[in-house]
């Protein structure tokens, strides 16, 4: 009995050493809601495989769950150099949020996270799975770009293009010209109406 107990303790110790030395890296994908397509999974795995070749070995994990709220991953506080993108689905509704570990908070400020999600909000809420995956890939690539910039990695084909980064950096850049055009149009209509009303109010001979 004593020998069996010693062997059990020895095995537990060996397992602990193994998990410590190997880093016990979490799986890149946990598709519990079964909504990720092949293209999305390929992107996630290929980019993370590149990260394995770096000194820091950051990771971007994508998780899907069958709920819309309380999406914070349980392993967030125990992880390092990791971004978690969580897609929730319940019925026809979908919700996407992402979280970063403390060592990446500088790259993922509240404004940065909001701008990334806002840029693809229609796709991320779409009931069309192809469009949803398109939006999710954009979020993943945006996160990858932030991580690469944080660790000064060379940008690659998995990162956002300059125009896509612009879309996030200046979320109101497209809306502003439209708003100005509408303002001028309204001013023009008001001017015409006032002029027309003034003419009608003039006495006729």
Describe these PLM feature segments.
Residues 3-4, 131, 172, 176:
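Hydrophobic, aromatic-rich alpha-helical transmembrane segments
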């Amino acid at each position: 009995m004593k020998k069996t107990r010693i062997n059990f303790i020895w095995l537990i110790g060996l397992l602990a050493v193994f998990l410590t030395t190997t880093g016990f890296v979490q799986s890149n994908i946990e598709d519990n809601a079964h909504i990720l397509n092949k293209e999305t999974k390929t992107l996630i795995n290929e980019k993370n495989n590149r990260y394995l070749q770096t000194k820091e070995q950051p990771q971007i994990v994508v998780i899907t769950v069958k709920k819309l709220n309380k999406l914070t991953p349980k392993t967030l506080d125990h992880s390092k150099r990791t971004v978690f993108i969580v897609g929730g689905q319940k019925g026809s509704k979908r919700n996407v949020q992402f979280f970063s570990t403390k060592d990446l908070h500088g790259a993922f400020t509240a404004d940065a996270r909001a701008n990334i999600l806002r840029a693809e909000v229609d796709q991320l809420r779409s009931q069309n799975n192809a469009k949803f995956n398109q939006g999710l890939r954009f979020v993943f690539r945006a996160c990858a770009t932030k991580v690469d910039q944080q660790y000064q990695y060379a940008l690659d084909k998995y990162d956002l293009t300059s125009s896509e980064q612009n879309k996030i950096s200046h979320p109101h850049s497209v809306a502003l010209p439209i708003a100005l055009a509408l303002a001028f149009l309204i001013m023009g209509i008001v001017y015409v109406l006032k002029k027309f009303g003034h003419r009608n109010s003039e006495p006729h001979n």
